[in-house]
A protein has these predicted regions:
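N-terminal localization/anchoring segments of enzymes in phospholipid and broader phosphate metabolism
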Residues: 1-356, 360
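Active-site metal-binding loops of divalent metal-dependent hydrolases
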Residues: 270, 370-371
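Helical hairpin unit composed of two closely spaced alpha helices linked by a short loop
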Residues: 371-383
Length: 383
């Protein structure tokens, strides 16, 4: 084993990628503040101050008229009120929630090319009551994902309950394994998954991984992508973190998806990190929920993953190769409709679904979330 002195270990710890990024971004912010101060206090400052104030006023008027979450608008308006000279410029730099024009163009092209893969099959919603059928139509129209019968769902109340089932399903993979996560971090949980992925890739299974670069920044080595590609695991780090101020640096991929052979899918709030299975302790007991879907509705997750994958890699000629022929369909007494929200429009699909659930509730509604940050509309509905 290579011995490293305490000094070497110290500098290795402080000179990691995230520390360097934070320091460089902070220096850029300080430089911009100095430039702004120099401009607004030097020759021509009256004109510059007037232009910046006018910009801030226009941004406030735009936010007031914008169809947007009220808490989000109030936050920005308050910031602009506190910093009238810089508030408008800060909104232009960091307030845009839509993806870059290039990524938006690619995502739109992918969605158009594979729209038929989201077509609603006839008869799938026949057993729904009128209220639920309305929600289903809304999800089909705005979420662009169909509803399915012949699907079973299993709920896991915590990560350590879901983990063994996930490993067992990964071991059964014969054709494809698709994974998409916000956090992937080296440790017991990831090692168990990685061992299976490497073995399956060596057997010829199509294994692909998308992970958020910021969410996984502290948990993965620098050469992670190279190591995965060498093992024939195709890999995409979403929105790589760079030590430069960027208009899209806060655009992150928080989805947690696993799709196995197009037959079984996992989703929920559980990332691939040890705290999610309580193998380590961070902030006490870590409780996130998971969901296992088996049957026809797993197809929606396949389309979600491939749509996003194709925005960064060359188009798949068709998704039909990943659509399983289910000889025996699981029996079920309900309808399952997995859906994804889109950054390409202003429609708050997920929030609208929750509001509709609350509006229809007659006796009780159970919500579970480890993070509670809701806007006024949701608070009003809960009251």
């Amino acid at each position: 084993m290579l011995f490293r002195s305490p000094i070497v270990r110290f500098f290795s710890r402080i000179l990691n990628r995230i520390t360097i990024t934070v320091v460089l971004v902070a220096l850029q912010l300080l430089w911009l503040c100095w430039v702004a101060f120099a401009i607004t206090t030097g020759t021509g400052r009256v004109w510059v101050n007037g232009l910046l104030n006018a910009l801030s006023l226009l941004i406030v008027l735009y936010l007031v008229r914008k169809d947007e979450n009220s808490a989000y608008k109030v936050g920005w308006i308050a910031l602009i009120g506190i910093l009238p000279l810089l508030g408008g410029a800060l909104y232009l730099a960091f307030g845009n929630k839509r993806p870059s024009r290039r990524l938006r163009s690619k995502m739109q092209a992918v969605e158009q090319a594979h729209r038929t893969d989201r077509a609603q099959q006839p008869g799938q919603t026949a057993g729904l009551c009128d209220e639920n059928r309305g929600v289903s139509r809304y999800l089909t129209q705005y979420g662009c994902y169909p509803a399915w019968q012949n699907t079973t769902a299993r709920y896991f109340s915590c990560g350590e309950a879901m983990y063994p089932a996930l490993l067992a399903d990964l071991e059964k993979a014969e054709k494809s394994i698709f994974l998409e996560f916000f956090i992937v971090s080296q440790g017991k949980m990831w090692q168990g998954v990685e061992d299976i992925l490497r073995r399956k890739a060596a057997q010829g299974v199509d294994v692909r991984l998308i992970y958020d670069d910021f969410g996984s920044l502290l948990g993965l080595p620098k050469d992670f992508v190279v190591r995965m590609e060498r093992a024939h695991i195709r890999c995409i780090p979403f929105n790589p973190v760079v030590p430069l101020l960027s208009l899209v640096m806060n655009h992150r991929d928080h989805r947690k998806i696993v799709v196995i052979d197009g037959k079984v899918a996992y989703t929920g709030g559980i990332n691939l990190a040890d705290e999610y299975i309580n193998a380590i302790t961070r902030f006490g007991y870590w409780k996130d929920a998971g969901l296992r879907i088996e049957g026809a509705a797993a197809w929606n997750f396949t389309v979600m993953f491939l749509d996003f994958w194709n925005a960064f890699r060359p188009f798949e000629q068709g998704y039909s190769a990943f659509r399983p022929q289910l000889a025996v369909l699981p029996a079920s007494d309900g309808v399952v409709q997995p859906y994804a929200d889109s950054p390409l429009d202003e429609e708050p699909v997920a929030e609208t679904v929750y509001l509709d659930i609350l509006a229809q509730a007659q006796q009780y509604v159970y919500f579970y979330t480890p993070y509670l940050a809701i806007g006024e509309e949701m608070l009003d509905a809960l009251r």
